[in-house]
């Protein structure tokens, strides 16, 4: 069962500044997957028709395989963000958007607060207004060719690597139109098997499976 926490109030009260973030000692690495409601690899005509009207929703997920924040061990935990904006999230990076941040309920209070503070501030522009921080069960597992993520009953994202037949794609004028939302190592284009948000906090729900709208990779910072 999901539990709303006092993390949102805590983060607002702390009013963390960029200088404070810079003095935080941290080291995190692990697996990452994201998907948005716009195809990242598609023909130019389709991309042009989608660019203004969609791409306003996204899910981002991190699995921390090794990590510490100011000496707090956060190894083994996952963090997921569900984002809904008023415009294409990539093309209009300063357009208003709202985010629900999910933090692994297996973490203790100190660990959850450290994760929420770090991810909220590192992704401040991408997240926009973080309207809720929720402690919930998070599953982030490897599949045969990608990752599968669940955050409580509200978020599901499964993506597999996109295998590109360049000759057939070139005939259709397909190309990559977007980059991942965050810096990655070994970034791979992906296809969503499932991509959905069914919560109520964002005043928007979506389901966008079977599209070339994902990125998979490794992160470290």
PLM features per residue range, with description:
Residues 20:
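Acidic/polar, glycine-anchored loop/turn motif associated with catalytic or activation segments
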Residues 8-17:
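Bacterial N-terminal signal peptides
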